[in-house]
Amino acid sequence: MLIPKRVKYRKQHRPRGNGGVSKGGREVSFGEYGIQALEAGWITNRQIEAARIAMTRYIKRGGKVWIRIFPDKPITQKPAETRMGSGKGAPEHWVAVVKPGRVMFEVAGVPEATAREAMRLAMHKLPVKCKFVVRGEVGEANES
């Protein structure tokens, strides 16, 4: 499970808005094929791990998988049936903030058909709309 080893502050503010597109990480840079987000969202460390397992099980021993996102934002939650007030809740889980255009996973060392199917299985585990991208092809991830 992906979590930060240590953080400066245990709790963060929730963001006001999720506007804009990803500034960096828009191209496939390590592998040959990738999964690119088409909408903004939070992806938990469990969802990242589920997608990774789905891909590696389908690929078997063939290729290499890169995870290009990291869950570095703590999400707090108060216990059930607790009265309001008395401070902010404890950190419950970690999420990676993803904006449109961000390449989240990459694969290399397998044929395109295998990579496409492995990525399709992984996309079902993620809470945002995604698309399959190939290295070198320029594709825009605009919300339409």
Swiss-Prot record:
GO cellular component assignments: cytosolic large ribosomal subunit
Stored CDD domains: Ribosomal_L16_L10e (cd01433)
Residue stretches of biased makeup (Basic residues): 1-16
Ranges in coiled-coil conformation: none
Gene3D superfamilies hit by this protein: Ribosomal protein L10e/L16 (3.90.1170.10)
InterPro entries: Ribosomal_uL16 (IPR047873), Ribosomal_uL16_bact-type (IPR000114), Ribosomal_uL16_CS (IPR020798), Ribosomal_uL16_dom (IPR016180), Ribosomal_uL16_sf (IPR036920)
Region (Disordered), start-end ranges: 1-25
Single annotated GO MF: tRNA binding
Keyword annotations of the record: Ribonucleoprotein, Ribosomal protein, RNA-binding, rRNA-binding, tRNA-binding
Annotated GO biological process: translation
PROSITE patterns, per the entry: RIBOSOMAL_L16_1, RIBOSOMAL_L16_2
Assembly description: Part of the 50S ribosomal subunit.
Family under the similarity heading: Belongs to the universal ribosomal protein uL16 family.
Function field: Binds 23S rRNA and is also seen to make contacts with the A and possibly P site tRNAs.
Record-given protein name: Large ribosomal subunit protein uL16
Organism (species): Desulforamulus reducens (strain ATCC BAA-1160 / DSM 100696 / MI-1) (Desulfotomaculum reducens)
Organism lineage: Bacteria, Bacillati, Bacillota, Clostridia, Eubacteriales
